[in-house]
Each structure stands twice: as structure tokens, then as C-alpha cells.
């Protein structure tokens, strides 16, 4: 689930978490996680650029770091791990999260920019997008799900909460 900012990631994460806590269904709760490196630059978000991944958590605001710490604590409780937002702990969280996503142990991953480029997990089948994307970033993000995976997955799904039609046409035309 790609979102436009750390604040949006927090809102979605807390909403899903609260829905799971208040659910009266007999089905197992969704396993939801989040990761981000720093708040997206408003100008870059407006035009749809995807920032490079960074493991420098010192660039995060204190509220972003506090939220990420809480989300990592939830993850630690779920998977019986002991990660943190310090530099090595964050990199190890990233690696373990990638492993859990590839193993289909995470039902929903909320990201701002991380995991949208360069991450390969062919079994992923749906990308929800609530952020502006364009050109290379759009093609890279959409490609995360649009990969064939044996006979069970012949295509991926993209669900957008923003109007990305012209950006998609422009990206396909360019590439």
C-alpha cells in the first residue's frame, strides 16, 4: 500500500490496526506492517517522484521516529523479533520485513517510498496506491505486482485512490 507521506502511513496503519482490534470476525487478523525512511518532500510527492531508500533514521522527525518505533514494536510482538529504529536495528528490520513479505507472512505492507523500486516478490498480487506517481517511479511501482508467478498468478492488480490515468499513459508512452 503506497501512500504519500509518513502522516498518511500512520493514519492507514492505525486505522487497519484499530479495525483488527475491534473486529468480531472469526477469521485471523490481518498482519499489517509499515516501513519508511523519512518524510516525503511535498514537492516530490506533488509530481510523483519516488525518493531513494535511505537507512538514515536520524533524518526522521521525532513524531515519525516515534510512530515507526511503535510499528516495529507491533512487528516484534507478531514475529517474536527484537528490532528497533537505531541504524543497525532498522536495516535488520528492513531485511526481515522483506523476507516476511516474500514468504507471504505479511498481508498488507504500508510504505511511503521504500519497497516501491528494486524489490522483487513475484507472488505479490495487488498494489494499492494513494500517492502521486509518474514516469520511472510509476512503472517501477506498478511492476512490483505485475509479474507472472506460475499458473496461479497471471497478472497483478493496481488499485489507485488518485487519478493516475494520464500519468500512466505518459509513462507507458515514454517507456
How should each PLM-predicted stretch be described?
Residues 2-111:
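Conserved C-terminal RecA-like helicase domain
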Residues 6-8, 38-42, 115-117, 132-135, ...:
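Conserved nucleotide-binding/hydrolysis micro-motifs of P-loop NTPases
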Residues 12-15, 44-48, 120-123, 139-140, ...:
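Short acidic, glycine/serine/threonine-rich loops at helix termini
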Residues 17-21, 48-53, 124, 142-147, ...:
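Generic alpha-helical propensity signal that fires on short helical segments
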Residues 18-29, 103-104, 121, 130-136, ...:
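Secondary-structure transition/capping motifs at alpha-helix termini
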Residues 40, 98, 102, 121-124, ...:
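Short capping/connector residues at structural and topological boundaries
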Residues 103-105, 138-175:
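Conserved segment of the helicase C-terminal RecA-like domain
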Residues 108-111, 115-142, 156-160:
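A short beta-strand element within the Helicase C-terminal
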Amino acid at each position: 500500500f503506497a501512500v504519500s507521506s509518513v502522516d498518511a502511513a500512520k493514519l492507514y496503519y492505525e486505522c487497519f490496526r484499530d479495525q483488527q482490534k475491534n473486529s468480531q470476525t472469526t477469521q485471523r487478523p490481518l498482519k499489517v506492517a509499515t516501513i519508511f525512511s523519512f518524510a516525503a518532500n511535498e514537492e516530490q510527492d506533488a509530481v510523483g517522484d519516488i525518493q531513494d531508500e535511505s537507512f538514515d533514521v536520524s533524518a526522521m522527525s521525532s513524531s515519525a521516529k516515534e510512530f515507526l518505533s511503535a510499528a516495529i514494536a507491533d512487528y516484534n510482538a507478531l514475529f517474536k523479533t527484537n528490532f528497533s529504529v537505531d541504524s543497525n536495528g532498522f536495516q535488520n528490520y528492513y531485511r526481515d520485513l522483506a523476507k516476511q513479505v516474500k514468504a507471504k507472512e505479511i498481508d498488507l505492507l504500508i510504505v511511503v517510498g521504500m519497497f516501491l523500486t528494486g524489490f522483487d516478490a513475484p507472488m505479490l498480487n495487488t498494489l494499492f496506491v494513494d500517492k502521486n506517481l509518474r514516469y520511472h517511479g510509476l512503472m517501477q511501482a506498478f511492476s512490483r505486482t505485475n509479474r507472472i508467478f506460475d499458473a496461479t498468478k497471471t497478472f497483478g492488480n493496481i488499485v489507485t485512490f488518485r487519478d493516475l490515468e494520464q500519468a500512466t499513459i505518459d509513462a507507458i508512452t515514454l517507456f
